[in-house]
Regions:
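Short, hydrophobic/aliphatic alpha-helical segments
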Residues: 3-21
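Long, charge-rich low-complexity segments
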Residues: 79-91, 193-206
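Amphipathic alpha-helical interface segments
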Residues: 80-149, 153, 165
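Amphipathic alpha-helical coiled-coil segments
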Residues: 59, 66-73, 115, 122, ...
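Transmembrane signal-anchor/signal-peptide helices with a preference for the extracytoplasmic
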Residues: 41-53
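Preference for long, well-ordered alpha-helical segments
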Residues: 125-128, 140-199, 206
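Conserved phosphate/anionic-ligand binding catalytic regions in large, soluble enzymes, centered on
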Residues: 17-40, 140-158
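A structural-propensity feature for long, helix-poor, extended segments
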Residues: 50-89
Length: 206
């Protein structure tokens, strides 16, 4: 089921249930899309304003990228469900089945792929939001800050959905490679999102 076609209320109700999906990965994707949209809204409120004529072309181009990014993040809600279900099924294989370990290993790696991609998309979103925060309408700068906070939360949430799976991998080389990618993104873009938030916040007290 593509939960992005349901209402917000329905999404939250299913999220709170014992259904295998959506879970943390799907929620991270949705929050990332919301954060991206908040940044994009700043762009929408900037375009067409004489005060920002010098940056209008840049903002329009950035908005187009964010439009695509929002869609891609929303697509990850269903992708996470599709890529998690094989792992959920693998847990049902009897422990004495000789194929269990190999099936679990493959399914676990597949389950990591979507949250890793969500993280990559969130990093891209944070870069875009930093531009909206710096060059977009001052009347909507708080929304850029909110967007950065949301996307950082999505970045962190997605990482946990990687780590819970890499912990169980037998192939530690693959696990550590994925962990390293996550740590690098968390360090660089978590700090960037924090800087956006602090800069926006400080601007209200000058």
């Amino acid at each position: 089921m593509d939960m992005t076609q349901e209402s917000c209320r329905k999404f939250v109700e299913v999220l709170a249930s014992d259904a295998p999906a959506p879970g943390g990965g799907g929620a991270a994707a949705l929050v990332g899309a919301i954060g991206t949209a908040l940044g994009n809204m700043v762009g929408s409120l900037t375009v067409g304003k004489k005060k920002y004529a010098e940056v209008e072309a840049e903002i329009i181009a950035l908005k187009a990228k964010c439009d695509a990014l929002q869609t891609e993040l929303l697509n990850q809600v269903e992708a996470d469900e599709v890529n998690f279900l094989p792992l959920a099924k693998a847990y049902g294989i009897p422990k004495d089945d000789p194929t269990r370990d190999a099936v679990m290993e493959e399914a676990t790696i597949i389950a990591c792929s979507t949250p890793l991609h969500i993280m990559e998309l969130c990093c891209e979103a944070i870069e875009y939001i930093s531009v909206f925060a710096a060059k977009g309408s001052r009347l909507a700068v708080s929304d850029a800050g909110c967007g950065a906070v949301c996307v950082k939360a999505a970045l962190q949430a997605a990482s946990l959905n990687v780590f819970i799976n890499t912990k169980t991998l037998k192939n530690r080389e693959v696990a550590e490679e994925m962990n390293a990618k996550c740590f690098a993104m968390l360090d660089k873009y978590g700090a960037m999102a924090d800087e956006i938030f602090e800069t926006v916040k400080a601007g209200f007290f000058k």
